[in-house]
């Protein structure tokens, strides 16, 4: 396994936050509705991990270090783990496992439908994020995994619908997402290695 320390570091960093939040909830420091806080934090954690995952390829192009790509799939699977925890926390703390309330929630809060669509797409991507699926799907695998940008759009819409009034934090994540999308445009992507390659030449001339 390449970059084992890097991979272990990513594992610890991703695993520690849900455990820390659970500890905070158990310690009664999350306010009067700790369950709702957990749901929100896990949802935001999912979005942040998705953005970090999408940043791995541009970072590899910019730096030339293969370690970014080495943890990309790991980060993607952690993103899926977070969204599963987000959904589980919603079912336990918001619905109270009362499935009869789900229809009421869907009518009152249609952003839940948007979130559910994002979850289903992430499920497909997680299930096919292995070498067997890559071999079976061939060139279609890359096309399928471009759905991650649809997931990003759904995640941002889901968050926008929830926050509504205070858009400052949402605007930060949306801007990062937009930048990552621009960096994946083929002409822009092709220019990144050239920009890096020009740096030593410029330094030599100076």
Swiss-Prot record:
<keyword id="KW-0288">FMN</keyword>
<keyword id="KW-0472">Membrane</keyword>
<dbReference type="GO" id="GO:0010181">
    <property type="term" value="F:FMN binding"/>
</dbReference>
<dbReference type="GO" id="GO:0020037">
    <property type="term" value="F:heme binding"/>
</dbReference>
<dbReference type="GO" id="GO:0016679">
    <property type="term" value="F:oxidoreductase activity, acting on diphenols and related substances as donors"/>
</dbReference>
<protein>
    <recommendedName>
        <fullName>Protein-methionine-sulfoxide reductase heme-binding subunit MsrQ</fullName>
    </recommendedName>
</protein>
<feature type="transmembrane region" description="Helical">
    <location>
        <begin position="110"/>
        <end position="130"/>
    </location>
</feature>
<dbReference type="GO" id="GO:0030091">
    <property type="term" value="P:protein repair"/>
</dbReference>
<feature type="transmembrane region" description="Helical">
    <location>
        <begin position="169"/>
        <end position="189"/>
    </location>
</feature>
<keyword id="KW-0249">Electron transport</keyword>
<keyword id="KW-0813">Transport</keyword>
<feature type="transmembrane region" description="Helical">
    <location>
        <begin position="10"/>
        <end position="30"/>
    </location>
</feature>
<feature type="transmembrane region" description="Helical">
    <location>
        <begin position="147"/>
        <end position="167"/>
    </location>
</feature>
<dbReference type="GO" id="GO:0009055">
    <property type="term" value="F:electron transfer activity"/>
</dbReference>
<keyword id="KW-0408">Iron</keyword>
<feature type="transmembrane region" description="Helical">
    <location>
        <begin position="42"/>
        <end position="62"/>
    </location>
</feature>
<keyword id="KW-0285">Flavoprotein</keyword>
<feature type="transmembrane region" description="Helical">
    <location>
        <begin position="75"/>
        <end position="95"/>
    </location>
</feature>
<keyword id="KW-1133">Transmembrane helix</keyword>
<dbReference type="InterPro" id="IPR013130">
    <property type="entry name" value="Fe3_Rdtase_TM_dom"/>
</dbReference>
<keyword id="KW-0997">Cell inner membrane</keyword>
<dbReference type="GO" id="GO:0005886">
    <property type="term" value="C:plasma membrane"/>
</dbReference>
<keyword id="KW-0479">Metal-binding</keyword>
<comment type="function">
    <text>Part of the MsrPQ system that repairs oxidized periplasmic proteins containing methionine sulfoxide residues (Met-O), using respiratory chain electrons. Thus protects these proteins from oxidative-stress damage caused by reactive species of oxygen and chlorine generated by the host defense mechanisms. MsrPQ is essential for the maintenance of envelope integrity under bleach stress, rescuing a wide series of structurally unrelated periplasmic proteins from methionine oxidation.</text>
</comment>
<dbReference type="GO" id="GO:0046872">
    <property type="term" value="F:metal ion binding"/>
</dbReference>
<comment type="subunit">
    <text>Heterodimer of a catalytic subunit (MsrP) and a heme-binding subunit (MsrQ).</text>
</comment>
<keyword id="KW-0349">Heme</keyword>
<comment type="similarity">
    <text>Belongs to the MsrQ family.</text>
</comment>
<dbReference type="Pfam" id="PF01794">
    <property type="entry name" value="Ferric_reduct"/>
</dbReference>
<keyword id="KW-1003">Cell membrane</keyword>
<dbReference type="InterPro" id="IPR022837">
    <property type="entry name" value="MsrQ-like"/>
</dbReference>
<keyword id="KW-0812">Transmembrane</keyword>
């Amino acid at each position: 396994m390449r970059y084992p320390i890097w991979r272990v570091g990513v594992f610890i960093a991703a695993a520690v936050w849900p455990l820390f939040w659970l500890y905070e909830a158990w310690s009664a420091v999350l306010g009067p509705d700790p369950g709702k806080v957990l749901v929100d934090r896990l949802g935001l954690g999912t979005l942040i991990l998705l953005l970090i995952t999408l940043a791995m390829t541009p970072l590899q192009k910019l730096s030339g270090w293969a370690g970014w790509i080495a943890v990309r799939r790991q980060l993607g699977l952690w993103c899926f783990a977070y969204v599963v925890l987000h959904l589980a926390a919603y079912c336990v703390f918001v619905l109270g496992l009362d499935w009869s309330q789900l229809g009421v929630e869907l009518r009152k809060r249609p952003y839940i439908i948007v979130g559910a669509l994002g979850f289903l797409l992430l499920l497909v991507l997680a299930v096919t994020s292995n070498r067997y699926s890559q071999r079976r799907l061939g060139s279609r695998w890359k096309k399928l995994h471009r759905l991650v940008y649809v997931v990003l759009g759904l995640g941002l819409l889901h968050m926008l619908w929830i926050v509504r009034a205070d858009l400052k934090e949402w605007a930060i994540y949306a801007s990062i997402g937009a930048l990552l999308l621009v960096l994946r445009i083929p002409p822009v992507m092709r220019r990144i290695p050239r920009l890096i390659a020009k740096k030593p030449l410029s330094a030599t001339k100076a």
